[in-house]
C-alpha cells in the first residue's frame, strides 16, 4: 500500500532527446538547445564510461550523485568555470525533468559542486561617457557610407539599443505589435532569455524616430501599410534584419562615427547594452531597477532587492543621457 510507483525505465540518450523536444516546444532558441545538447551528451558519455557500459545502455534510474560527480570531475578538468556552470545547469534541468517524468526518485545534482564564477565587469564604450552621443550625432549626419544608405533605420537600431539595453536577439525579435501603450506611456514587449517577457518603457524621442523610420520604410518600398506581425528592424530588401546583418551594421556605424577604438574587445551590439546600464547606474538607478530593465534573473550577490514600481523603473529609464541626444536629433531631423 505504501510502496512507491515503479520508475519509468529509459536509457539516457532517449531521455535527453525527450528533454530537448520539450525545450524546443517551449520555443527556446536553437542556439540554447544546441548548447544544452552538447553538454548533456558529452557528460553522458563520460558517465557511461565510468559505469562501464555503452551510453545507450546507461539507464536514467542508475544516475546517482557519485556517478554524476565523477563525470563532472572528468568533464571539468580542461574547461573554464563558465563552461562547467553551463553544463551543470543543463544537467540540473535534465534531471529535474527526469524526476517529473518518473524516471528518477530525486535529482542527484545537489551532490555535484559547481565552481564560483567571478562577476564579469561591464564593458561600456570607453572614454568620458560621450561616445554614445558622438555615435548618434555622426550617424544622424550621414557619416555611415553605404551603397544604399538608410539613416532613419540606422538611428532606430542604435537608439533602441542605447535606451532599452536590449540584447541582439531581443532587438531582432521586436515586431510592430510589440510596441503598445498610450502616448507618453509607450512600452515594448520583449521576449528575453528562456522565453521570459518584460515590458520596457520608451520615451517620445525614440517614439518619434521610430515613426519617422516607419514612414521612410513605407516610401522606400512603395507600401501603404505594415502588418503588426512585421519585424520592426529590416534590411534594405525589407527582410527581417538577421544577427549577422545587425552586427555588420553596428560595426560599420562605430567605424564611420570614428569611435571603433572605444569598443572593448568581445563586445559589439552588447557594448550598447553595457553603455545603457552603466550610464543609468551613474545617474542613480538602483540594482533592482537595472535588473528589471535588463531582464536579468538575479542581482549580484550582496546587493539587496529594492522595491520598485513601474513608475520608478520608467523614471530610471528616463535618466538615460541618450534621450537628450535623440530629442535634439528628432527636433532638428525634418523629413530626412
Where would I find each of the regions flagged by the language model?
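Conserved catalytic core of the tyrosine transesterase superfamily
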Residues: 1-336
Amino acid at each position: 500500500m505504501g510502496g512507491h510507483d515503479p520508475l519509468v525505465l529509459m536509457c539516457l540518450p532517449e531521455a535527453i532527446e525527450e528533454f530537448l523536444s520539450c525545450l524546443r516546444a517551449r520555443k527556446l532558441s536553437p542556439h540554447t538547445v544546441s548548447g544544452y545538447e552538447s553538454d548533456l551528451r558529452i557528460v553522458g558519455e563520460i558517465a557511461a564510461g565510468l559505469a562501464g557500459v555503452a551510453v545507450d545502455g546507461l539507464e536514467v534510474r542508475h544516475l546517482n550523485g557519485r556517478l554524476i560527480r565523477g563525470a563532472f570531475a572528468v568533464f571539468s578538468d580542461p574547461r573554464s568555470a563558465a563552461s562547467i556552470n553551463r553544463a551543470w545547469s543543463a544537467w540540473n534541468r535534465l534531471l529535474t525533468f527526469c524526476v517529473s517524468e518518473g524516471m528518477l526518485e530525486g535529482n542527484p545534482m545537489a551532490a555535484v559542486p559547481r565552481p564560483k564564477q567571478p562577476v564579469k565587469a561591464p564593458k561600456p564604450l570607453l572614454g568620458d561617457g560621450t561616445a554614445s552621443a558622438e555615435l548618434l550625432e555622426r550617424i544622424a549626419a550621414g557619416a555611415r557610407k553605404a551603397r544604399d544608405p538608410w539613416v532613419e533605420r540606422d538611428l532606430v537600431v542604435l537608439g533602441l539599443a542605447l535606451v532599452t539595453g536590449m540584447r541582439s536577439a531581443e532587438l531582432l525579435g521586436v515586431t510592430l505589435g510589440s510596441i503598445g501603450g498610450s502616448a507618453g506611456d509607450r512600452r515594448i514587449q520583449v521576449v528575453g532569455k528562456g522565453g521570459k517577457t518584460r515590458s520596457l518603457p520608451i520615451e517620445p524621442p525614440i517614439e518619434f524616430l521610430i515613426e519617422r523610420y516607419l514612414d521612410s520604410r513605407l516610401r522606400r518600398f512603395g507600401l501603404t501599410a505594415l502588418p503588426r506581425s512585421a519585424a520592426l528592424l529590416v534590411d534594405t530588401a525589407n527582410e527581417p534584419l538577421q544577427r549577422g546583418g545587425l552586427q555588420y551594421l553596428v560595426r560599420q556605424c562605430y567605424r564611420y562615427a570614428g569611435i571603433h577604438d572605444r569598443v572593448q574587445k568581445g563586445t559589439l551590439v552588447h557594448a550598447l547594452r553595457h553603455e545603457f546600464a552603466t550610464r543609468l547606474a551613474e545617474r542613480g538607478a538602483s540594482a533592482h531597477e537595472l535588473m528589471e530593465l535588463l531582464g536579468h534573473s538575479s542581482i549580484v550577490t550582496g546587493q539587496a532587492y529594492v522595491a520598485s514600481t513601474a513608475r520608478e523603473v520608467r523614471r530610471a529609464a528616463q535618466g538615460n543621457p541618450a534621450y537628450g541626444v535623440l530629442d535634439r536629433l528628432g527636433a532638428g531631423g525634418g523629413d530626412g
